[in-house]
């Protein structure tokens, strides 16, 4: 089946828009290396477009009506935005849903130890990483430290050009013969992913002198002591900015593009769509990389609760209205797909793979080995999606996640489908997914945004 190359469709004016969107996208990535940082930006962007905090509306008991724009944050790690349409909300919403957590390495609660005059922080990796990717490269520390009096200290060390960086060391090849005999899953063990944070001792201190020096420095410069790490969330991420990639600058290379490339384009699309007939919604959520668990993951009830609050203030304070609204909704689960890599052909079935530069990707299903754990979108919904995309000149492709018995993956799609709504995965093809630095095509980023705008505006279309 013939595929369209998105780049061929652009005139000079559109090409400028393609590159301009990626410029602002790179800024979003640089300022959002954690889920908390992404939520801060989302709130800033939303308020600039006239969105109001739902919590303030609840306090004032102000009725919600068509034309109102609302956002709701949950524990500073997830956010939902609503643009209330003129149609009865019980007829359903058009929902975009992406995740803003990414694979990384987290600092343990009791992490600090000194060995051979070197001070380390012990860690526990988060999400599906290849552990050997993370050694011998500059790393930054982002997150929060919360003291017993409730004071929250925001931490961002390693991404300013004047900041120090950190690293996880590796064994030199001259002594690495035994290490090199291990398989890739074992060549770097999880317990060996310890972050080197200092080596200078306090003068005239022979025992744990480095520990004392660093502890003094942390208290003086950052305002917390070692014991405060018990109530900290510190994330170790690659140090450095998102960059244009290729002689033609046609790609973006950056950390966290799974799934912030879809989060950003979903957010931009949501804020671009103004007066709507059918209520629109954008969800940016946490914890997808570890199964969407916990209070800030999609398996929690925070989104359902937010919808219930909105409906109550619209004069529909009953569970039936909530159920009707959710069941009648349509969703694009905005998540990335595995881009075909000609260096690793054995992992893909070429007819059903996604390709860089060929537009936004629809995954009718994900899951693994027999579609296990999958949301399998209905053919009727896929037909509706095709109609919306083609009537809006969006370049799109369809794909599966690799060969049938090789592996697979999942998204938040199956969770939202529990409400009975139509859901399909839709996002951007990525090379080197889950590596510290991932690669996307600027054409695909642009087509994703165009796709999301078209979907949000699809009010009169029936399935």
What name fits each language-model region?
Residues 1-463:
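N-terminal hydrophobic/helix-forming segments and targeting peptides
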């Amino acid at each position: 089946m013939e595929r369209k190359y998105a780049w061929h469709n652009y005139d000079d004016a559109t090409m400028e828009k393609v590159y301009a969107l990626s410029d602002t996208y790179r800024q979003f990535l640089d300022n959002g290396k954690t889920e908390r940082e992404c939520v801060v930006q989302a709130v800033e962007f939303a308020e600039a477009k006239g969105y109001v905090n739902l919590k303030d509306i609840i306090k004032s008991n102000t009725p919600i009506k068509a034309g109102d724009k609302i956002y709701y944050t949950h524990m500073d790690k997830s956010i939902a935005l609503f643009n209330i349409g003129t149609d009865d909300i019980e007829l359903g919403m058009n929902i975009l849903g992406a995740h803003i957590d990414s694979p990384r390495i987290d600092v343990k609660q009791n992490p600090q130890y000194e060995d051979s005059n070197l001070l380390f922080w012990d860690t526990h990796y988060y999400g599906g990483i290849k552990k050997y990717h993370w050694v011998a490269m500059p790393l930054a520390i982002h997150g929060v430290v919360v003291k017993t009096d409730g004071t929250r200290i925001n931490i961002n060390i390693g991404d300013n050009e004047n900041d120090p960086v950190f690293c996880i060391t590796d064994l030199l090849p001259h002594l690495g013969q035994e290490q090199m005999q291990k398989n890739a899953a074992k060549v770097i063990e999880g317990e060996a992913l310890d972050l080197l944070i200092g080596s200078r001792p306090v003068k005239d201190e022979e025992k744990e002198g480095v520990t004392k020096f660093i502890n003094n420095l942390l208290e003086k410069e950052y305002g917390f002591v070692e014991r405060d790490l018990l109530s900290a969330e510190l994330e170790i991420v690659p140090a450095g900015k998102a960059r244009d990639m290729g002689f033609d600058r046609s790609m973006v290379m950056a950390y966290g593009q799974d799934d912030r490339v879809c989060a950003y384009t979903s957010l931009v699309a949501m804020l671009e769509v103004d007066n709507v007939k059918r209520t629109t919604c954008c969800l940016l959520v946490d914890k997808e990389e570890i199964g969407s668990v916990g209070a800030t993951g999609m398996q929690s009830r925070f989104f359902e609760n937010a919808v219930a609050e909105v409906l109550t203030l619209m004069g529909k304070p009953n569970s039936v209205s909530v159920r009707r609204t959710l069941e009648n909704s349509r969703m694009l689960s905005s998540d990335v797909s595995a881009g075909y890599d000609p260096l690793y052909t054995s992992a893909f079935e070429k007819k059903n793979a996604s390709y860089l530069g060929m537009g936004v990707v629809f995954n009718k299903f994900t899951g693994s080995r027999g579609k296990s754990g999958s949301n399998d979108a209905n053919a009727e919904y896929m037909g509706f999606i095709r109609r919306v995309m083609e009537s809006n000149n969006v370049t799109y492709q369809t794909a599966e996640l690799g060969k049938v018995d090789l592996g697979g993956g999942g998204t938040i799609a199956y969770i939202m489908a529990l409400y009975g709504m139509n859901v399909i995965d839709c996002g951007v093809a990525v090379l080197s997914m889950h590596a510290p630095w991932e690669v996307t095509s600027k054409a695909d980023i642009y087509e994703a945004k165009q796709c999301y705008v078209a979907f949000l505006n699809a009010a009169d279309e029936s399935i």
